[in-house]
Amino acid sequence: MTDRLERKLAIAANQDKADLLIKNGQIVDVFQLETFEGDVVIADGEIVAISDPGTYEAHEEVDAKGAFIAPAFIDGHVHIESSMVAPEQFAKVVVPHGVTTVIADPHEIANVAGVQGVEYMLDASEGIPLDVKMMVPSCVPATPFEHSGARLTAEEVAELFRDPRIFGLGEVMDYPAVLTRDQEMMAKLKAAHSEGRIVDGHGAGLDSVALNAYTAAGIGNDHEAVTPEEAKARLQRGMYLLIREGTAAKDFDALMKAITPMNSRRALFVTDDKHLDELVEEGSIDHHVRKAIQIGVNPLQAIQMASLNAAECFKLAKKGAIAPGFTADLLFIEDLQSLAITHVFKNGTCVAKNGKLIVPIRETVQPPQRLLESVNMKLVTKEQLELSLQSDEEAHLIQIQPGSIVTKHIREKVAVKDGVFIPSVARDQLKLVVAERHHKRGTVGVGIVKGFGLTKGAIATTVAHDSHNIVAVGTNDEDLLAAIKELENIQGGMTIVKDGKVLVSLPLTIGGLMSDQSYDVVCEQIKSVDAAIGALGFVGDFNPFLTLSFLALPVIPEIKLTDQGLFDVTSFSFIDQQVYAEETN
Protein backbone atom coordinates (compact mmCIF):
# COMPACT_ATOMS: atom_id res chain seq x y z
CA MET A 1 0.00 0.00 0.00
CA THR A 2 2.79 2.40 0.95
CA ASP A 3 4.76 1.64 -2.22
CA ARG A 4 1.65 2.16 -4.31
CA LEU A 5 0.88 5.43 -2.57
CA GLU A 6 4.44 6.66 -3.00
CA ARG A 7 4.41 5.75 -6.69
CA LYS A 8 1.11 7.52 -7.16
CA LEU A 9 2.45 10.64 -5.47
CA ALA A 10 5.66 10.54 -7.49
CA ILE A 11 3.67 10.42 -10.71
CA ALA A 12 1.26 13.12 -9.56
CA ALA A 13 4.27 15.31 -8.71
CA ASN A 14 5.59 14.70 -12.24
CA GLN A 15 8.63 12.82 -10.93
CA ASP A 16 7.86 9.52 -12.64
CA LYS A 17 6.07 8.24 -15.73
CA ALA A 18 2.40 7.30 -15.53
CA ASP A 19 0.92 4.08 -16.87
CA LEU A 20 -1.46 5.85 -19.24
CA LEU A 21 -1.98 9.38 -20.49
CA ILE A 22 -5.13 10.38 -22.34
CA LYS A 23 -4.52 13.44 -24.48
CA ASN A 24 -6.42 15.75 -26.81
CA GLY A 25 -9.64 15.52 -24.86
CA GLN A 26 -12.19 17.91 -23.40
CA ILE A 27 -12.47 16.99 -19.72
CA VAL A 28 -15.97 17.13 -18.26
CA ASP A 29 -15.78 18.83 -14.87
CA VAL A 30 -18.84 17.54 -12.98
CA PHE A 31 -18.00 19.70 -9.96
CA GLN A 32 -18.38 23.02 -11.77
CA LEU A 33 -20.35 21.90 -14.84
CA GLU A 34 -17.82 23.04 -17.37
CA THR A 35 -15.35 21.50 -19.80
CA PHE A 36 -11.70 22.27 -20.44
CA GLU A 37 -8.93 20.93 -22.63
CA GLY A 38 -6.47 18.78 -20.76
CA ASP A 39 -4.70 15.48 -20.24
CA VAL A 40 -5.83 12.71 -17.89
CA VAL A 41 -2.97 10.92 -16.14
CA ILE A 42 -3.57 7.38 -14.86
CA ALA A 43 -1.57 4.98 -12.68
CA ASP A 44 -2.66 1.66 -11.17
CA GLY A 45 -6.19 2.17 -12.42
CA GLU A 46 -6.58 5.54 -10.74
CA ILE A 47 -6.52 9.11 -11.98
CA VAL A 48 -3.50 10.79 -10.42
CA ALA A 49 -3.52 14.08 -12.30
CA ILE A 50 -5.37 16.28 -14.76
CA SER A 51 -3.20 18.82 -16.49
CA ASP A 52 -2.55 21.19 -19.32
CA PRO A 53 -1.58 19.34 -22.49
CA GLY A 54 2.00 18.09 -22.58
CA THR A 55 2.76 18.38 -18.87
CA TYR A 56 3.10 14.67 -18.02
CA GLU A 57 4.61 11.60 -19.66
CA ALA A 58 3.38 8.00 -19.61
CA HIS A 59 4.37 4.57 -20.86
CA GLU A 60 1.25 4.54 -23.02
CA GLU A 61 -0.76 7.32 -24.62
CA VAL A 62 -4.30 7.34 -25.95
CA ASP A 63 -5.49 10.10 -28.24
CA ALA A 64 -9.05 11.16 -27.41
CA LYS A 65 -9.17 13.05 -30.72
CA GLY A 66 -11.17 15.91 -29.30
CA ALA A 67 -13.78 13.76 -27.56
CA PHE A 68 -15.27 14.75 -24.22
CA ILE A 69 -13.80 12.73 -21.36
CA ALA A 70 -16.54 12.11 -18.79
CA PRO A 71 -16.90 9.94 -15.71
CA ALA A 72 -18.54 6.59 -16.34
CA PHE A 73 -22.14 6.09 -15.25
CA ILE A 74 -23.56 4.42 -12.16
CA ASP A 75 -26.93 2.64 -12.04
CA GLY A 76 -28.18 3.43 -8.55
CA HIS A 77 -30.65 0.56 -8.29
CA VAL A 78 -30.97 -2.50 -10.46
CA HIS A 79 -32.13 -6.08 -10.26
CA ILE A 80 -29.77 -7.87 -12.62
CA GLU A 81 -32.15 -10.81 -12.72
CA SER A 82 -34.71 -8.67 -14.56
CA SER A 83 -32.40 -8.56 -17.56
CA MET A 84 -32.98 -12.33 -17.80
CA VAL A 85 -29.26 -13.03 -18.19
CA ALA A 86 -26.56 -13.91 -15.67
CA PRO A 87 -24.24 -11.17 -14.33
CA GLU A 88 -21.45 -12.04 -16.76
CA GLN A 89 -23.75 -11.49 -19.73
CA PHE A 90 -25.33 -8.43 -18.12
CA ALA A 91 -21.89 -6.80 -18.00
CA LYS A 92 -21.41 -7.44 -21.72
CA VAL A 93 -24.56 -5.43 -22.38
CA VAL A 94 -24.36 -2.45 -20.01
CA VAL A 95 -20.63 -1.69 -19.98
CA PRO A 96 -20.54 -0.62 -23.66
CA HIS A 97 -23.36 1.78 -22.77
CA GLY A 98 -21.06 3.55 -20.32
CA VAL A 99 -22.16 1.91 -17.07
CA THR A 100 -19.24 0.61 -15.03
CA THR A 101 -20.86 0.43 -11.59
CA VAL A 102 -24.26 -0.83 -10.47
CA ILE A 103 -25.95 -0.98 -7.09
CA ALA A 104 -27.56 -4.40 -7.36
CA ASP A 105 -30.27 -5.88 -5.17
CA PRO A 106 -30.53 -9.66 -5.72
CA HIS A 107 -33.85 -10.02 -3.95
CA GLU A 108 -35.36 -11.72 -6.98
CA ILE A 109 -33.12 -14.75 -6.73
CA ALA A 110 -33.10 -14.53 -2.93
CA ASN A 111 -36.86 -15.06 -2.97
CA VAL A 112 -36.22 -18.27 -4.88
CA ALA A 113 -33.17 -19.64 -3.08
CA GLY A 114 -32.35 -17.44 -0.08
CA VAL A 115 -28.72 -17.11 0.98
CA GLN A 116 -27.68 -19.60 -1.69
CA GLY A 117 -29.14 -17.34 -4.36
CA VAL A 118 -27.35 -14.26 -3.00
CA GLU A 119 -24.05 -16.12 -2.85
CA TYR A 120 -24.45 -17.24 -6.45
CA MET A 121 -24.95 -13.62 -7.55
CA LEU A 122 -21.88 -12.55 -5.57
CA ASP A 123 -19.75 -15.25 -7.19
CA ALA A 124 -21.12 -14.56 -10.68
CA SER A 125 -20.38 -10.84 -10.30
CA GLU A 126 -16.70 -11.26 -9.47
CA GLY A 127 -13.95 -10.81 -12.02
CA ILE A 128 -16.05 -9.00 -14.64
CA PRO A 129 -15.48 -5.47 -16.04
CA LEU A 130 -18.36 -4.12 -13.98
CA ASP A 131 -18.34 -3.11 -10.32
CA VAL A 132 -21.38 -4.78 -8.78
CA LYS A 133 -22.12 -3.34 -5.36
CA MET A 134 -24.36 -6.06 -3.97
CA MET A 135 -27.00 -5.25 -1.40
CA VAL A 136 -28.35 -7.89 0.96
CA PRO A 137 -32.12 -8.10 0.45
CA SER A 138 -34.10 -6.77 3.39
CA CYS A 139 -37.53 -8.19 2.61
CA VAL A 140 -37.51 -11.83 1.58
CA PRO A 141 -40.34 -12.41 1.21
CA ALA A 142 -41.59 -8.88 0.61
CA THR A 143 -44.58 -9.52 2.88
CA PRO A 144 -46.06 -12.48 4.77
CA PHE A 145 -48.98 -12.50 2.33
CA GLU A 146 -47.36 -14.75 -0.29
CA HIS A 147 -45.33 -17.95 -0.39
CA SER A 148 -41.78 -17.42 -1.58
CA GLY A 149 -39.10 -20.00 -2.20
CA ALA A 150 -37.04 -18.85 0.77
CA ARG A 151 -36.78 -16.45 3.68
CA LEU A 152 -33.91 -14.24 4.79
CA THR A 153 -33.95 -13.83 8.54
CA ALA A 154 -32.34 -11.01 10.48
CA GLU A 155 -29.67 -13.47 11.58
CA GLU A 156 -28.90 -14.42 7.98
CA VAL A 157 -28.79 -10.76 6.97
CA ALA A 158 -26.32 -10.03 9.77
CA GLU A 159 -24.22 -13.01 8.70
CA LEU A 160 -24.16 -11.82 5.08
CA PHE A 161 -22.88 -8.44 6.25
CA ARG A 162 -19.69 -10.24 7.28
CA ASP A 163 -18.99 -10.90 3.61
CA PRO A 164 -16.90 -7.93 2.41
CA ARG A 165 -18.62 -8.18 -0.98
CA ILE A 166 -21.93 -7.08 0.55
CA PHE A 167 -22.38 -3.34 0.17
CA GLY A 168 -25.53 -2.47 2.11
CA LEU A 169 -29.14 -3.32 2.96
CA GLY A 170 -31.46 -3.62 -0.01
CA GLU A 171 -34.70 -1.75 -0.57
CA VAL A 172 -36.97 -1.82 2.47
CA MET A 173 -40.26 -2.74 0.82
CA ASP A 174 -42.17 -3.78 3.91
CA TYR A 175 -42.66 -0.21 5.09
CA PRO A 176 -45.47 -1.17 7.52
CA ALA A 177 -42.83 -3.21 9.37
CA VAL A 178 -40.78 -0.02 9.73
CA LEU A 179 -43.74 2.05 10.90
CA THR A 180 -44.87 -0.58 13.43
CA ARG A 181 -41.29 -1.19 14.56
CA ASP A 182 -41.49 -4.89 13.78
CA GLN A 183 -38.60 -6.47 15.67
CA GLU A 184 -37.34 -8.55 12.75
CA MET A 185 -37.14 -5.43 10.60
CA MET A 186 -35.58 -3.45 13.43
CA ALA A 187 -32.87 -6.09 13.76
CA LYS A 188 -32.05 -5.83 10.04
CA LEU A 189 -31.89 -2.04 10.16
CA LYS A 190 -29.75 -2.08 13.29
CA ALA A 191 -27.39 -4.60 11.71
CA ALA A 192 -26.94 -2.32 8.70
CA HIS A 193 -26.42 0.79 10.80
CA SER A 194 -23.95 -0.93 13.13
CA GLU A 195 -21.88 -1.90 10.08
CA GLY A 196 -22.12 1.63 8.66
CA ARG A 197 -23.92 0.35 5.56
CA ILE A 198 -26.22 2.15 3.13
CA VAL A 199 -29.94 1.35 3.46
CA ASP A 200 -32.00 1.54 0.28
CA GLY A 201 -35.59 2.75 0.23
CA HIS A 202 -38.81 1.61 -1.40
CA GLY A 203 -41.43 4.01 -0.06
CA ALA A 204 -44.28 3.46 -2.50
CA GLY A 205 -47.32 5.58 -1.70
CA LEU A 206 -46.11 6.84 1.69
CA ASP A 207 -47.84 9.90 3.10
CA SER A 208 -45.86 12.67 4.79
CA VAL A 209 -46.02 11.19 8.29
CA ALA A 210 -45.01 7.73 7.12
CA LEU A 211 -42.23 9.25 5.04
CA ASN A 212 -40.91 11.06 8.12
CA ALA A 213 -40.70 7.80 10.04
CA TYR A 214 -39.19 6.02 7.06
CA THR A 215 -36.46 8.64 6.71
CA ALA A 216 -35.85 8.68 10.46
CA ALA A 217 -35.11 4.96 10.20
CA GLY A 218 -31.95 5.89 8.29
CA ILE A 219 -33.30 5.11 4.84
CA GLY A 220 -31.59 7.68 2.64
CA ASN A 221 -32.91 7.15 -0.87
CA ASP A 222 -36.06 6.12 -2.70
CA HIS A 223 -36.89 5.03 -6.23
CA GLU A 224 -40.66 4.71 -5.73
CA ALA A 225 -41.69 8.35 -6.19
CA VAL A 226 -44.00 8.52 -9.20
CA THR A 227 -45.21 12.15 -9.15
CA PRO A 228 -43.47 15.54 -8.89
CA GLU A 229 -45.11 16.02 -5.50
CA GLU A 230 -43.72 12.75 -4.19
CA ALA A 231 -40.31 13.68 -5.58
CA LYS A 232 -40.31 17.00 -3.74
CA ALA A 233 -41.46 15.37 -0.51
CA ARG A 234 -38.41 13.13 -0.57
CA LEU A 235 -36.02 15.92 -1.48
CA GLN A 236 -37.42 18.06 1.34
CA ARG A 237 -36.50 15.32 3.79
CA GLY A 238 -32.94 15.07 2.57
CA MET A 239 -33.40 11.84 0.68
CA TYR A 240 -31.74 11.15 -2.62
CA LEU A 241 -34.32 10.89 -5.38
CA LEU A 242 -33.71 7.89 -7.62
CA ILE A 243 -35.34 8.60 -10.98
CA ARG A 244 -36.52 5.32 -12.44
CA GLU A 245 -36.96 4.45 -16.09
CA GLY A 246 -37.17 0.73 -16.72
CA THR A 247 -39.32 -1.55 -18.82
CA ALA A 248 -42.50 -1.57 -16.73
CA ALA A 249 -42.01 1.47 -14.49
CA LYS A 250 -41.38 4.64 -16.47
CA ASP A 251 -41.28 7.56 -14.03
CA PHE A 252 -38.68 9.74 -15.74
CA ASP A 253 -41.08 12.19 -17.41
CA ALA A 254 -43.09 12.82 -14.25
CA LEU A 255 -40.15 13.12 -11.87
CA MET A 256 -38.00 15.36 -14.05
CA LYS A 257 -40.70 18.00 -13.71
CA ALA A 258 -39.54 18.37 -10.10
CA ILE A 259 -35.85 18.69 -10.96
CA THR A 260 -34.21 22.11 -11.20
CA PRO A 261 -30.58 23.27 -11.26
CA MET A 262 -31.08 24.10 -7.57
CA ASN A 263 -32.01 20.58 -6.43
CA SER A 264 -30.54 18.28 -9.07
CA ARG A 265 -27.54 17.38 -6.91
CA ARG A 266 -29.83 15.12 -4.85
CA ALA A 267 -31.16 13.25 -7.88
CA LEU A 268 -29.74 10.32 -9.83
CA PHE A 269 -30.84 7.70 -12.32
CA VAL A 270 -31.82 4.03 -11.94
CA THR A 271 -33.25 1.32 -14.16
CA ASP A 272 -34.62 -0.96 -11.41
CA ASP A 273 -36.09 -3.60 -13.74
CA LYS A 274 -35.23 -3.51 -17.42
CA HIS A 275 -35.51 -6.30 -19.94
CA LEU A 276 -32.53 -7.37 -21.99
CA ASP A 277 -33.89 -6.30 -25.37
CA GLU A 278 -34.44 -2.73 -24.16
CA LEU A 279 -30.99 -2.62 -22.56
CA VAL A 280 -29.48 -3.64 -25.88
CA GLU A 281 -31.58 -1.35 -28.06
CA GLU A 282 -31.89 1.86 -26.04
CA GLY A 283 -29.32 1.46 -23.30
CA SER A 284 -29.10 1.67 -19.54
CA ILE A 285 -28.33 4.88 -17.64
CA ASP A 286 -27.14 6.45 -20.89
CA HIS A 287 -30.79 6.35 -21.96
CA HIS A 288 -31.71 8.51 -18.94
CA VAL A 289 -28.97 10.98 -19.79
CA ARG A 290 -30.11 11.26 -23.40
CA LYS A 291 -33.71 11.77 -22.34
CA ALA A 292 -32.66 14.49 -19.90
CA ILE A 293 -30.68 16.28 -22.61
CA GLN A 294 -33.62 16.00 -25.01
CA ILE A 295 -35.92 17.83 -22.58
CA GLY A 296 -33.46 20.67 -22.17
CA VAL A 297 -31.30 19.65 -19.21
CA ASN A 298 -27.71 20.88 -19.47
CA PRO A 299 -25.75 17.84 -20.76
CA LEU A 300 -23.13 18.36 -18.07
CA GLN A 301 -25.81 18.39 -15.38
CA ALA A 302 -27.30 15.18 -16.79
CA ILE A 303 -23.86 13.54 -16.75
CA GLN A 304 -23.36 14.79 -13.19
CA MET A 305 -26.63 13.14 -12.12
CA ALA A 306 -25.51 9.85 -13.69
CA SER A 307 -22.07 9.89 -12.11
CA LEU A 308 -21.11 12.19 -9.23
CA ASN A 309 -24.59 12.34 -7.70
CA ALA A 310 -24.89 8.57 -7.71
CA ALA A 311 -21.42 8.15 -6.26
CA GLU A 312 -22.14 10.58 -3.44
CA CYS A 313 -25.51 8.99 -2.71
CA PHE A 314 -23.81 5.65 -2.12
CA LYS A 315 -20.66 7.07 -0.52
CA LEU A 316 -18.43 5.87 -3.33
CA ALA A 317 -15.73 8.43 -2.64
CA LYS A 318 -13.47 7.35 -5.50
CA LYS A 319 -16.10 7.27 -8.22
CA GLY A 320 -18.04 9.77 -10.27
CA ALA A 321 -15.52 12.37 -11.49
CA ILE A 322 -12.45 13.01 -13.61
CA ALA A 323 -10.07 14.21 -10.91
CA PRO A 324 -7.01 13.05 -8.94
CA GLY A 325 -7.83 10.27 -6.50
CA PHE A 326 -10.80 8.99 -8.50
CA THR A 327 -10.99 5.57 -10.12
CA ALA A 328 -10.21 5.74 -13.84
CA ASP A 329 -13.70 4.72 -14.96
CA LEU A 330 -14.34 7.10 -17.83
CA LEU A 331 -15.98 7.60 -21.19
CA PHE A 332 -15.14 9.19 -24.51
CA ILE A 333 -18.18 11.05 -25.81
CA GLU A 334 -17.99 12.45 -29.34
CA ASP A 335 -21.07 14.63 -29.08
CA LEU A 336 -22.76 15.73 -25.86
CA GLN A 337 -26.18 16.40 -27.38
CA SER A 338 -26.55 12.88 -28.75
CA LEU A 339 -24.34 11.35 -26.06
CA ALA A 340 -22.36 9.35 -28.61
CA ILE A 341 -20.18 7.11 -26.42
CA THR A 342 -17.25 5.66 -28.37
CA HIS A 343 -14.94 4.32 -25.64
CA VAL A 344 -15.43 2.99 -22.10
CA PHE A 345 -12.52 2.69 -19.68
CA LYS A 346 -12.63 0.58 -16.51
CA ASN A 347 -9.81 1.08 -14.02
CA GLY A 348 -7.76 2.74 -16.73
CA THR A 349 -8.23 -0.03 -19.31
CA CYS A 350 -10.33 0.42 -22.42
CA VAL A 351 -12.98 -2.30 -22.13
CA ALA A 352 -15.49 -1.24 -24.80
CA LYS A 353 -15.40 0.51 -28.16
CA ASN A 354 -18.25 1.62 -30.37
CA GLY A 355 -20.89 -0.31 -28.46
CA LYS A 356 -18.99 -3.60 -28.08
CA LEU A 357 -17.05 -5.12 -25.20
CA ILE A 358 -13.46 -5.70 -26.32
CA VAL A 359 -12.07 -7.58 -23.32
CA PRO A 360 -12.70 -11.26 -22.55
CA ILE A 361 -14.91 -12.30 -19.65
CA ARG A 362 -14.11 -15.39 -17.64
CA GLU A 363 -16.28 -18.49 -17.95
CA THR A 364 -19.75 -18.33 -16.47
CA VAL A 365 -20.13 -19.43 -12.85
CA GLN A 366 -22.13 -22.65 -12.61
CA PRO A 367 -25.34 -22.06 -10.62
CA PRO A 368 -26.10 -24.44 -7.74
CA GLN A 369 -28.48 -27.29 -8.54
CA ARG A 370 -31.23 -25.74 -6.45
CA LEU A 371 -31.39 -22.84 -8.89
CA LEU A 372 -31.57 -25.18 -11.87
CA GLU A 373 -34.49 -27.13 -10.38
CA SER A 374 -36.59 -24.28 -9.01
CA VAL A 375 -40.08 -25.20 -10.25
CA ASN A 376 -41.52 -27.64 -7.72
CA MET A 377 -45.30 -27.52 -7.74
CA LYS A 378 -48.43 -29.55 -7.31
CA LEU A 379 -50.62 -30.15 -10.32
CA VAL A 380 -52.92 -27.17 -10.84
CA THR A 381 -56.46 -28.32 -11.63
CA LYS A 382 -59.25 -26.66 -13.55
CA GLU A 383 -61.31 -26.58 -10.36
CA GLN A 384 -58.64 -24.43 -8.70
CA LEU A 385 -59.04 -21.85 -11.45
CA GLU A 386 -62.76 -21.42 -10.80
CA LEU A 387 -63.69 -18.05 -9.28
CA SER A 388 -67.04 -18.08 -7.52
CA LEU A 389 -69.08 -14.87 -7.89
CA GLN A 390 -72.65 -13.65 -7.69
CA SER A 391 -74.03 -12.42 -10.97
CA ASP A 392 -75.92 -9.46 -9.50
CA GLU A 393 -72.99 -7.81 -7.72
CA GLU A 394 -69.81 -6.04 -8.77
CA ALA A 395 -66.36 -7.58 -8.41
CA HIS A 396 -62.99 -6.12 -7.42
CA LEU A 397 -60.72 -5.84 -10.47
CA ILE A 398 -57.06 -5.07 -11.03
CA GLN A 399 -56.69 -2.33 -13.66
CA ILE A 400 -53.20 -2.19 -15.14
CA GLN A 401 -51.61 1.13 -16.07
CA PRO A 402 -49.18 0.88 -19.00
CA GLY A 403 -45.81 2.38 -18.11
CA SER A 404 -46.36 1.89 -14.40
CA ILE A 405 -46.21 -0.94 -11.88
CA VAL A 406 -48.93 0.79 -9.86
CA THR A 407 -52.38 -0.66 -10.53
CA LYS A 408 -55.84 0.81 -10.03
CA HIS A 409 -58.44 -0.82 -7.81
CA ILE A 410 -61.71 -0.73 -9.74
CA ARG A 411 -65.15 -2.29 -9.37
CA GLU A 412 -67.15 -3.61 -12.30
CA LYS A 413 -69.89 -6.08 -13.07
CA VAL A 414 -68.47 -9.17 -14.74
CA ALA A 415 -69.78 -12.14 -16.69
CA VAL A 416 -70.89 -14.99 -14.43
CA LYS A 417 -72.27 -18.41 -15.38
CA ASP A 418 -73.47 -20.96 -12.83
CA GLY A 419 -71.89 -18.87 -10.09
CA VAL A 420 -68.45 -18.84 -11.72
CA PHE A 421 -66.61 -15.93 -13.38
CA ILE A 422 -66.29 -16.16 -17.16
CA PRO A 423 -63.50 -14.10 -18.80
CA SER A 424 -64.84 -11.53 -21.25
CA VAL A 425 -62.79 -10.42 -24.23
CA ALA A 426 -65.41 -7.81 -25.10
CA ARG A 427 -65.09 -6.20 -21.66
CA ASP A 428 -61.34 -6.86 -21.45
CA GLN A 429 -61.90 -8.74 -18.19
CA LEU A 430 -59.41 -11.60 -18.15
CA LYS A 431 -58.55 -14.24 -15.60
CA LEU A 432 -55.37 -13.73 -13.58
CA VAL A 433 -53.74 -16.68 -11.81
CA VAL A 434 -50.86 -16.90 -9.33
CA ALA A 435 -49.73 -20.46 -8.53
CA GLU A 436 -47.12 -21.35 -5.91
CA ARG A 437 -44.15 -23.08 -7.56
CA HIS A 438 -41.43 -23.49 -4.94
CA HIS A 439 -42.39 -26.09 -2.33
CA LYS A 440 -45.45 -27.93 -3.68
CA ARG A 441 -47.84 -26.09 -1.39
CA GLY A 442 -50.52 -26.13 -4.04
CA THR A 443 -51.82 -22.64 -3.27
CA VAL A 444 -53.46 -20.82 -6.17
CA GLY A 445 -54.82 -17.28 -6.24
CA VAL A 446 -57.37 -16.30 -8.89
CA GLY A 447 -58.48 -12.78 -9.79
CA ILE A 448 -59.70 -10.54 -12.59
CA VAL A 449 -57.51 -8.12 -14.50
CA LYS A 450 -58.36 -5.41 -16.99
CA GLY A 451 -56.09 -3.74 -19.54
CA PHE A 452 -54.15 -6.52 -21.27
CA GLY A 453 -56.44 -6.64 -24.27
CA LEU A 454 -55.81 -10.30 -25.12
CA THR A 455 -58.53 -11.75 -27.36
CA LYS A 456 -57.43 -15.37 -27.16
CA GLY A 457 -54.97 -17.68 -25.42
CA ALA A 458 -52.82 -17.17 -22.33
CA ILE A 459 -49.36 -16.08 -21.28
CA ALA A 460 -47.47 -17.12 -18.16
CA THR A 461 -44.12 -16.55 -16.48
CA THR A 462 -42.13 -17.58 -13.41
CA VAL A 463 -40.89 -13.99 -13.11
CA ALA A 464 -43.49 -12.72 -10.64
CA HIS A 465 -42.19 -10.09 -8.26
CA ASP A 466 -41.14 -10.64 -5.66
CA SER A 467 -41.84 -14.22 -4.59
CA HIS A 468 -41.60 -15.42 -8.19
CA ASN A 469 -44.40 -17.89 -8.24
CA ILE A 470 -46.10 -18.55 -11.57
CA VAL A 471 -48.32 -15.71 -12.77
CA ALA A 472 -50.57 -16.15 -15.79
CA VAL A 473 -53.28 -14.21 -17.59
CA GLY A 474 -55.65 -15.62 -20.15
CA THR A 475 -59.00 -15.77 -21.87
CA ASN A 476 -59.79 -19.39 -20.93
CA ASP A 477 -58.87 -22.03 -18.37
CA GLU A 478 -57.55 -24.60 -20.86
CA ASP A 479 -54.85 -22.29 -22.17
CA LEU A 480 -54.02 -21.08 -18.67
CA LEU A 481 -53.49 -24.66 -17.49
CA ALA A 482 -51.37 -25.46 -20.55
CA ALA A 483 -49.20 -22.39 -19.96
CA ILE A 484 -48.64 -23.26 -16.31
CA LYS A 485 -47.73 -26.85 -17.22
CA GLU A 486 -45.26 -25.66 -19.86
CA LEU A 487 -43.40 -23.56 -17.29
CA GLU A 488 -43.09 -26.61 -15.07
CA ASN A 489 -41.75 -28.64 -17.99
CA ILE A 490 -39.05 -26.10 -18.92
CA GLN A 491 -38.20 -25.29 -15.28
CA GLY A 492 -39.15 -21.66 -15.52
CA GLY A 493 -39.34 -18.87 -18.03
CA MET A 494 -42.02 -17.32 -20.22
CA THR A 495 -44.56 -18.96 -22.49
CA ILE A 496 -47.39 -18.12 -24.88
CA VAL A 497 -50.24 -20.58 -25.47
CA LYS A 498 -53.12 -20.54 -27.93
CA ASP A 499 -55.77 -23.22 -28.46
CA GLY A 500 -53.97 -25.52 -26.05
CA LYS A 501 -50.70 -25.37 -27.98
CA VAL A 502 -47.46 -23.71 -26.93
CA LEU A 503 -46.57 -21.09 -29.54
CA VAL A 504 -43.23 -20.14 -28.03
CA SER A 505 -41.32 -20.41 -24.77
CA LEU A 506 -38.28 -18.64 -23.38
CA PRO A 507 -36.53 -20.90 -20.83
CA LEU A 508 -35.09 -19.14 -17.78
CA THR A 509 -33.38 -22.06 -16.13
CA ILE A 510 -31.48 -20.16 -13.42
CA GLY A 511 -34.08 -19.88 -10.69
CA GLY A 512 -36.83 -19.36 -13.25
CA LEU A 513 -35.41 -15.83 -13.62
CA MET A 514 -32.31 -15.88 -15.82
CA SER A 515 -31.15 -17.76 -18.87
CA ASP A 516 -27.91 -19.71 -18.97
CA GLN A 517 -27.43 -18.63 -22.59
CA SER A 518 -25.47 -15.70 -24.04
CA TYR A 519 -27.23 -12.37 -24.27
CA ASP A 520 -27.43 -12.45 -28.06
CA VAL A 521 -29.20 -15.83 -27.98
CA VAL A 522 -31.64 -14.55 -25.37
CA CYS A 523 -32.29 -11.43 -27.46
CA GLU A 524 -33.35 -13.64 -30.37
CA GLN A 525 -35.61 -15.63 -28.06
CA ILE A 526 -37.20 -12.42 -26.82
CA LYS A 527 -37.86 -11.39 -30.42
CA SER A 528 -39.65 -14.70 -30.96
CA VAL A 529 -41.82 -14.05 -27.90
CA ASP A 530 -42.59 -10.51 -29.06
CA ALA A 531 -43.55 -11.79 -32.50
CA ALA A 532 -45.83 -14.50 -31.10
CA ILE A 533 -47.79 -12.32 -28.67
CA GLY A 534 -49.64 -10.73 -31.58
CA ALA A 535 -51.32 -14.08 -32.23
CA LEU A 536 -53.26 -13.52 -28.99
CA GLY A 537 -54.60 -10.21 -30.23
CA PHE A 538 -52.23 -8.11 -28.13
CA VAL A 539 -51.75 -4.61 -29.56
CA GLY A 540 -50.66 -2.71 -26.44
CA ASP A 541 -47.70 -0.31 -26.33
CA PHE A 542 -46.31 -1.90 -23.16
CA ASN A 543 -44.39 -5.07 -22.34
CA PRO A 544 -47.08 -7.58 -21.35
CA PHE A 545 -44.75 -9.98 -19.56
CA LEU A 546 -43.06 -7.37 -17.39
CA THR A 547 -46.41 -5.77 -16.59
CA LEU A 548 -47.75 -9.22 -15.69
CA SER A 549 -44.73 -9.91 -13.49
CA PHE A 550 -45.61 -7.03 -11.14
CA LEU A 551 -49.25 -7.97 -10.61
CA ALA A 552 -48.25 -10.29 -7.77
CA LEU A 553 -46.24 -7.71 -5.79
CA PRO A 554 -48.26 -6.74 -2.69
CA VAL A 555 -46.13 -3.74 -1.72
CA ILE A 556 -47.00 -1.64 -4.77
CA PRO A 557 -50.41 0.09 -4.76
CA GLU A 558 -53.27 -0.30 -5.22
CA ILE A 559 -54.35 -3.93 -5.61
CA LYS A 560 -52.46 -7.14 -6.41
CA LEU A 561 -52.91 -10.91 -6.47
CA THR A 562 -50.73 -13.43 -4.64
CA ASP A 563 -50.97 -17.21 -4.42
CA GLN A 564 -53.00 -16.63 -1.25
CA GLY A 565 -55.61 -14.33 -2.76
CA LEU A 566 -56.57 -10.80 -3.77
CA PHE A 567 -54.65 -8.18 -1.80
CA ASP A 568 -55.65 -4.56 -1.17
CA VAL A 569 -52.35 -2.71 -0.74
CA THR A 570 -54.06 0.40 0.64
CA SER A 571 -55.57 -1.47 3.60
CA PHE A 572 -52.70 -3.99 3.53
CA SER A 573 -55.11 -6.89 3.79
CA PHE A 574 -56.76 -9.59 1.73
CA ILE A 575 -60.19 -8.87 0.31
CA ASP A 576 -62.87 -11.01 -1.26
CA GLN A 577 -63.28 -10.89 -5.02
CA GLN A 578 -66.94 -10.02 -4.62
CA VAL A 579 -68.06 -6.47 -3.84
CA TYR A 580 -70.63 -6.76 -1.07
CA ALA A 581 -73.52 -4.40 -0.42
CA GLU A 582 -71.94 -2.83 2.65
CA GLU A 583 -68.88 -1.82 0.57
CA THR A 584 -71.00 0.33 -1.73
CA ASN A 585 -72.48 2.41 1.08
Curated annotation (Swiss-Prot):
Q: What is its EC number?
A: 3.5.4.2
What Gene Ontology molecular function terms does this protein carry?
Answer: adenine deaminase activity
**Which reaction does this chain catalyze?**
adenine + H2O + H(+) = hypoxanthine + NH4(+)
Q: From the record, what ranges are coiled-coil?
A: none
Q: Which cofactor does it need?
A: Mn(2+)
> Which Pfam families does this entry report, sorted A to Z?
Adenine_deam_C (PF13382), Amidohydro_1 (PF01979)
Q: Which InterPro entries match?
A: Adenine_deam (IPR006679), Adenine_deam_C (IPR026912), Amidohydro-rel (IPR006680), Metal-dep_hydrolase_composite (IPR011059), Metal_Hydrolase (IPR032466)
Q: Which UniProt keywords apply?
A: Hydrolase, Manganese
Gene Ontology biological-process entries:
adenine catabolic process
Keyword Hydrolase tagged: yes
Tell me which CDD domains the record gives.
Answer: AdeC
Q: Where is the signal peptide?
A: none
- Annotated TM spans: none
Instruction: Indicate the enzyme's highest-level EC class.
Output: hydrolase
Instruction: Provide the family line.
Output: Belongs to the metallo-dependent hydrolases superfamily. Adenine deaminase family.
What is this protein's name?
Adenine deaminase
State the organism named in the record. Answer: Halalkalibacterium halodurans (strain ATCC BAA-125 / DSM 18197 / FERM 7344 / JCM 9153 / C-125)
Gene coding for it: ade
